[in-house]
């Protein structure tokens, strides 16, 4: 009679279970870390387990499997020789704002994960920080029956998902900042310049248009900041 292999869930942040697994490894036994969604360890609690195993001099072997980040990157048509992986962006507003500013300056292709109920918000944030014309591809249901890849620009995909309710988990592949000569103006600098023009007597809509052309931020967004 075949011995049944014990299966346990590992969701991270469980020190008791983590130490029990390490004890198994240190007793010269093996375990397999598997996932029902993507490659274990990539935006996954498995990373915590692998880190602990390496710290305790346990051998770790990876059998390559599917990964949404690289799969979406390959089919995006965007440059893939150099790219950066962001996973899910921070939820805390201050950290999220800083991360978005960093992404807006990034010359490499960037890969981001997002849930369906937060996708529109992410696209709106990317439109503000990166500009609505930044190239983008959004993939869902990768390697499955209803696989879908949508994209060209942030503006176009935002319009698409406003008309078609987002479903499934999304992998966003964002083109890099092609402006190599000059970095995009920071949000605070753009708003400071806008306020200076207003104080100098420039009309609000004219000032917003000028700073939009100079900074890359949308005129509508800049104008809205004047009335908050």
Stretches found by the model and what they are:
Residues 1-62, 70-71:
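Class I S-adenosyl-L-methionine
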Residues 2-5, 50-51, 76-81, 129-130, ...:
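Short, hinge-like loop/turn segments at secondary-structure boundaries
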Residues 4-10, 60-61, 81-87, 133-138, ...:
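Short hydrophobic/aromatic-enriched beta-strand-loop microsegments
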Residues 7-15, 66, 87-92, 141-143:
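Short, acidic/turn-prone active-site loops that include or flank metal/cofactor-
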Residues 29-30, 109, 116-228:
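A contiguous loop/helix-start segment that scaffolds small-molecule binding in enzyme catalytic cores
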Residues 35, 62-65, 112, 138:
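General beta-strand structural signal in soluble alpha/beta enzymes
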Residues 48-106:
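Class I SAM-dependent methyltransferase SAM-binding "motif I" and its flanking Rossmann-like core
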